[in-house]
Amino acid sequence: MASEDPSVSGVSGRYATALFELARDEKSIDAVTADLDKFSAMLAGSPDLVRLVRSPVFASEVQGKALAAVLDKAGITGISANFLKVLAANRRLFVVADVIRAYRALVAKFKGEATADVTVAEKLSDKNLEALKAALKSVTGKDVALNINVDPAIIGGLVVKLGSRMVDSSLRTKLNSIKHAMKEAG
């Protein structure tokens, strides 16, 4: 399955595929997804956790013990916790964000959903998220799972990547277009 989908290739794809197949066999796809979403949110909110995950300075034992404490406090148990501990033991914790992204892609494919990567300048409200999902569903004919990335550098608007298609309606791109047009005219 991983070889068919370019979004789940490489080391992260192999780990994501293994986790997905285990979760599917144990009928716990939704529980694992919820745990990974929780861990992903923890990463987004904690620079210290990001350092622990990404730094090669920490030995795998140190990473494993610290990770076990974090997972215990967050209430992440079972398949998800064991999987994250395996990543730490195998010195692959630095790819956890890519593994989570690839896992989500596998789950979306399994459920017949499309996945869109959306970059926005600031966090979207729930109302705007639902409107975006509805607009993308009307285009694809499928339910669309969103991977939201907040990047203030785009200034405003959004960038949507859905499969091989990309729509860049960011203010940064529009300003760059105006800048280039003015250079050509002047």
UniProtKB/Swiss-Prot annotation:
GO terms for molecular function: proton-transporting ATP synthase activity, rotational mechanism. Signal peptide: none annotated. Keywords: ATP synthesis, Cell inner membrane, Cell membrane, CF(1), Hydrogen ion transport, Ion transport, Membrane, Transport. It is a peripheral membrane protein. One of its GO terms (cellular component) is plasma membrane. Gene3D superfamilies: N-terminal domain of the delta subunit of the F1F0-ATP synthase. Its main location: membrane. The keyword Cell inner membrane applies. InterPro entries: ATP_synth_OSCP/delta_N_sf (IPR026015), ATPase_OSCP/d_CS (IPR020781), ATPase_OSCP/dsu (IPR000711). It is found in: Cell inner membrane. Belongs to the ATPase delta chain family. F-type ATPases have 2 components, F(1) - the catalytic core - and F(0) - the membrane proton channel. F(1) has five subunits: alpha(3), beta(3), gamma(1), delta(1), epsilon(1). CF(0) has four main subunits: a(1), b(1), b'(1) and c(10-14). The alpha and beta chains form an alternating ring which encloses part of the gamma chain. F(1) is attached to F(0) by a central stalk formed by the gamma and epsilon chains, while a peripheral stalk is formed by the delta, b and b' chains. PANTHER family: ATP SYNTHASE DELTA CHAIN. F(1)F(0) ATP synthase produces ATP from ADP in the presence of a proton or sodium gradient. F-type ATPases consist of two structural domains, F(1) containing the extramembraneous catalytic core and F(0) containing the membrane proton channel, linked together by a central stalk and a peripheral stalk. During catalysis, ATP synthesis in the catalytic domain of F(1) is coupled via a rotary mechanism of the central stalk subunits to proton translocation. This is ATP synthase subunit delta. It comes from Rhodopseudomonas palustris (strain TIE-1). The lineage of its organism: Bacteria, Pseudomonadati, Pseudomonadota, Alphaproteobacteria, Hyphomicrobiales. The gene is atpH.
